[in-house]
Amino acid sequence: MSKMLYIIGLSTLLFSCASQKPSTTRKASARTTTTTAKTPVKPGPVTGVPASRPGLTVLHGVEFYTQNIGDITKNDNTMSHGSIVVAKPAGYHVVKTYFPAVAQNFRQRYVILHYTALDEDKSASVLTQQAVSSHYLINNKRNDEIYQLVDENKRAYHSGISAWRKDKNLNDTSIGIEIVNPGFTTDASGRKIFVPYDEHQIKKLAALLKDIVNRYQIPPTNVLGHSDVAPTRKQDPGPLFPWKKLYDQYQIGMWYDEAAKQGFMTQMTPETFMMEQSNSTFIFKVQTFLQQFGYDINPTGAWDKENMKVVEAFQYRFRPENYSGVVDMETWAILQALVQKYPQK
């Protein structure tokens, strides 16, 4: 397994130095030099040389920018978690006199979690040799290793047709993490029986997620499961994935406030809810709330197989005790509490 994969530990800094030329033997260690980039002139005519500022580092001729001078409130960030890719136009020299512009951010705006539904060897084989991939693979071994399969700056093929809130095709903007887990089996009644995750896998995943969401400023609303972004097609990471534990113990992802849920529960009696449950106006409202929260659903005022899968996906994550695809009173209260806590901007 270790021969096929580039294995990483839990490191907070990744350098993509693939563009280096093979080095020759040296008596001294490789020398790191630091140059300074210049601050752009303020709007108006250029009247002189901009003041310099630190941050641009050169290692073996490969450049890195290690500081953020962007507006953090706008999610702008100038830091490079890897080498800077620079054009090499024939006959011309690209300079960084005014590098970096403050108006930029990361491609990586989402993290999407999956289970592999395979054992470790098959998971590694499929994710590295077929037309599907992920950036990271969490193994099921009790060690300190996490497998990296794709450069974070590259697009992995893990989510397929996907959507969340205003964004679609989330492979373009996400980091994919696969977890070795069998997924589910089906009992005689057709009900899915999911397999729990090992505690050591969750610890690895939490450390990896902490690093990624901190580096790329990924908000809680953008840490998602495959079933969140493709609810009519996918079930992973399933109802036994510990979303609440990630939220409570590691401050990762979303969860509702219990007090808010209870408040919404008291707004309708069980008898009233039973009467409203089949009302088209009420159904349309529930579907609209699912859409407002982020799910790709078209409100129709009626339940069908497709939009019940959206409810099921929501329950996998936030109501795992009941993932029937039917909106009960508690599911409705949880949905309202989440829309209130995490409104779309």
Task: Describe the residue ranges of each PLM region.
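Sec-dependent signal peptide recognition
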Residues: S2-I8
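C-terminal motif of bacterial Sec signal peptides marking the signal peptidase cleavage site
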Residues: F15-S16
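Active-site-adjacent loop/helix surface patches within enzyme catalytic domains
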Residues: T24-P219
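Stable alpha-helical elements in mature extracytoplasmic
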Residues: G55-G61, Y65-N68, R107-R109, Q201-L208, ...
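Second-shell loop/turn segments in exported
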Residues: F99-P100, K122-A124, A163-K166, S189-H200, ...
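Acidic, His- and aromatic-enriched active-site or binding-groove loops in soluble protein domains
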Residues: L137-I138, P239-T266
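Acidic/histidine-rich, metal-coordinating catalytic segments
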Residues: I218-R233
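Short acidic, glycine/serine/threonine-rich helix-capping segments at coil-helix boundaries
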Residues: F273-K285, Q291-L338, Q344
